[in-house]
Amino acid sequence: MDSKNTQVAIVGRPNVGKSTLFNRLVGERRAIVGDEPGITRDRIYGEVEWAGRKFSLIDTGGIVPDDDAVIPANILKQAGVAIDQSQLLVWVVDARAGITQLDEELAALLRSTGKPVLIAANKTDSAKLESESTEFFRFGFDDVFPISAEQSIGVGELLDRIVETLEHAVVDDAEPSASAELRLAIVGRPNVGK
């Protein structure tokens, strides 16, 4: 797995702990963290090494799909670039808040990418919240990881699955599919026997 070509984007709505998770995974405080929404506006890149594997990690600002204000629109654009560049998306949700309307919108957006999505149910720092984080399975993605980025709870399991998913993605990209659809276009002037 080549870290320069293997990228993982951390995405989610504002104030769910994306930058805290980013800092935890890269092992240093690179992204600014605060209680106010909209602190992270541009993409922030870092390198992660886990279980002998390296990959690039991208922190994004909080996504608000239907906000027409200039700053949120730019954040959405920056997040879109990160999503396009990545082979895997880590969707951070707030386990304390539960599912919100914005989470519903983001689920549809992330599903439309066709990329693998791992849900990190952040702020899960009690057994009750860990149990309640299973509600995020309702979005139809394969994995929900109850974590606390601040306290490093569940982060190792999330990293294990990131590495495993990236290894499968790299193998799948390297092997052409036998069922790949062939597209053919026959073009020419009208009435020439195409």
Q: Where on the chain are the PLM-derived regions?
A:
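Short glycine-/polar-rich loops that comprise or flank the Walker A/P-loop
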Residues: 6, 84-89, 113-117, 140-143, ...
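Conserved nucleotide-binding/hydrolysis micro-motifs of P-loop NTPases
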Residues: 37-39, 62-64, 96-98, 123-128, ...
